[in-house]
Amino acid sequence: MITDFEDFCTWVFVVVDDTLSQIAPLVKRPGPKPQCTDSELIAMCLIGECRGWHMETELLSCWKEYQHLFPNIPSQSRFNRRRRNLMQAMNLIRIVLLRSLDLSQDRQCLIDSLPIPVVQFHLVPSSSGDWQAFQAIFGKAITKKQTFFGYRLHLLVTLSGVILDFELTPANSSDLEAGFELLSEHTDLEVLGDKAYISAAIAAELWEKNRIALRTVPRANQKQQVSETFKHLHNTIRQLIETVNGQLAGQFAIEKNFAHSFWGLCTRLYSKLTAHTLCIYLNRLLGKQDFLQIKALAFPN
């Protein structure tokens, strides 16, 4: 049971340390052991994501108030460098936890995307980052009726709210094309998508090659329609992915970029997505029925 913030920190560290020991041969790096271990640094990152400490200056400053938990806090430059070097380890931790979750075995999923802006619109011409070298471009955030510069994050989420897979693409990429690429890595799924994923040809190919049933509500001008009951059920279920997107945009501030480079952005995305999976994993360990209530873990009463 997690009764306070220090309990939460202990649980996160133990899970991270145990999982990292399982994948140690894959992430082993040369050189002497640092005072702040990899497990400690990753735990600090993931806990910081859950608490909303998204800027490194804020993160390190906040951890100084809890130095009895993590006594060997690196300097900001060293912390930043080691965090980038450990981003693949963080993603492997996410994958290991995901595979051990019973919820990840759900064969019914949702697919959607959300904008990942990297530079404010008016600052793009003077930006000194490497964004354009890594295909950052202008795109439209339809729901917000805004143009942004950056990428889109495409998510495959189970009906229980677990992020099964993801893909980062340029901001102007088609949801349908990116979704097809993402789903092509999976088999035997039933996937609900919005109208951006309507394509009889793509749906047929996914079914034939991957046994994936891609289901969408047809546009009003299409001949073949579905019942109002199906439309209502479809829209009700799809609200779940809005919940997950809301968690990522709210608690994890995934649409706010504090990175100055593409690899810095990737590091932060891995950190946020791993933290989300970890929170669901902890809730399952604790036997909580409402396992999507993840904010309460980092802010216990």
Regions found by a protein language model. Give the residues of each.
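Short alpha-helical elements
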Residues: M1-N301
